[in-house]
Amino acid sequence: HPRVRRQRQMCIRDRAKFDKLVAPKGYPWKLTDILPKVLPAGENAGFLTPEGAKRLDVSGHLKAGVPVCPPEGDAGTGMVATNAVKQRTGNVSAGTSSFSMIVLEKELSKPYEMIDMVTTPDGSLVAMVHCNNCTSDLNAWINLFKEYQELLGIPVDMNELYGKLYNHALAGDADCGGLISYNYISGEPVTGLADGRPLFVRSANDKFNLANFMRTHLYASVGVLKIGNDILFNEEKIKVDRITGHGGLFKTKGVGQRILAAAINSPISVMETAGEGGAWGIALLGSYLVNNEKNQSLADFLEDKVFAGDAGIEISPTAEDVAGFNTYIENYKAGLPVEEAATRFKK
């Protein structure tokens, strides 16, 4: 199976390195002897044993014999939860950190340091861009406005505050009026920084107003994600039919979608179920194991039996927003030495 083959290729070097490191210990096993086999979605990974049932539930109510599907981490379950396992689909998770997963039709032309290669639960190749920072710095600025409102003696509804500030950002200039934000609570490997300092930068002649201020921080939340995905879409010419967004950035209806659509120049969909995340994703993989009577592919099973054609609410990018974000990201990349200097001189 392609998933098994790819996983073996990706892990063989690490296995050999591990075996070499533990060789002086004289263990009677190799790493491959004790690790479970890699299985694609839909394969039976075993059954819950009586001993296992007792460990999970000492009361004895949990019965043995439950079939077990192959496990997945956040990336795999996120793809399933957003119906993004088919080639030419993808998903973006945007919260405290962010990552995009684009399911490829073919391998990339060469390796890229900022792009990780993984697979869907059923074995398709996926290009992953992971960013350490997303909404944390943005949330810190929102909390500053919360403090100001409290100082005035005005009751604060956080949902209303987020909604008003996020939506006001859309009234700003498409290029944020020259304002730049680096949301680096921690370092960002994609931009080559091992450490980070949250930084807001402007020139005296930039258009400094609240709308542009909020817009630059929203742009910053997906700025690094854009840099990584520009490689896929502009250099590798990757094609996608649908990208689904999920996570806290999309909680204020329409705003995060529009910002992300401008960043990667692609329509973005958001589904009501996307917020369910990993637990729901692995439950769907369990359902695929036991309820796939028609022997469908995972993509077809999700499309027909789970989502039933529901692609969510889609927002397409405007030419003005795309051009503005492109200008913003050029200013952003040009200013990265300022961010790097901040990590050296601000402790």
Task: Locate each region found by the language model.
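Intrinsic disorder/low-complexity segments enriched in polar/small residues
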Residues: 8-10, 31, 347
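ATP-dependent carbohydrate kinase catalytic cores
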Residues: 13-122, 255-260
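Glycine/Thr-rich phosphate-binding loops that ligate phosphate moieties of nucleotide
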Residues: 6, 37-51, 69-70, 102-347
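Short, flexible hinge/linker loops that cap or flank conserved catalytic cores
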Residues: 2-4, 62, 237
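Single conserved hydrophobic/aromatic residue that forms the stacking wall/gate
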Residues: 1-12
